Amino acid sequence: MAKPAARPRKKIKKTVVDGIAHIHASFNNTIVTITDRQGNALSWATSGGSGFRGSRKSTPFAAQVAAERAGQAALEYGLKNLDVNVKGPGPGRESAVRALNGCGYKIASITDVTPIPHNGCRPPKKRRV
């Protein structure tokens, strides 16, 4: 028996004033996620998803483009103020924060939340080029 056609649900438009921007800057890519205070994702973007491939993904310009895309997508929720959490040692840390500032957000705080091991896992071996 065929299922009855489900009516499309109306997307509830919520307005959020304060949010958190999580910037994960690794050596290979930069991921920017903008959430509300509870941690529910409003928008996200990556350097790879913004059209950069290979070694160009890990550039500061690619991180800037990813942050601009995530910031513009989150503007439709009425977001005004951002706290920024930066994680990782990648090259796109500062440029992503500057791009969010350029989108018109008022940045209240910038916090470095990079996990630091207390002598945990063994690090990868050093590169010999």
Swiss-Prot record:
InterPro entries: Ribosomal_uS11, Ribosomal_uS11_bac-type, Ribosomal_uS11_CS, Ribosomal_uS11_sf. Gene3D superfamilies: Ribosomal protein S11. The keyword GTP-binding does not apply. The keyword Ribosomal protein applies. One of its GO terms (cellular component) is ribosome. GO terms for molecular function: rRNA binding; structural constituent of ribosome. It comes from the Bacteria. Keywords: Ribonucleoprotein, Ribosomal protein, RNA-binding, rRNA-binding. GO terms for biological process: translation. Belongs to the universal ribosomal protein uS11 family. Located on the platform of the 30S subunit, it bridges several disparate RNA helices of the 16S rRNA. Forms part of the Shine-Dalgarno cleft in the 70S ribosome. HAMAP family: Ribosomal_uS11. Part of the 30S ribosomal subunit. Interacts with proteins S7 and S18. Binds to IF-3. This is Small ribosomal subunit protein uS11. It comes from Pseudomonas fluorescens (strain ATCC BAA-477 / NRRL B-23932 / Pf-5). The gene is rpsK.
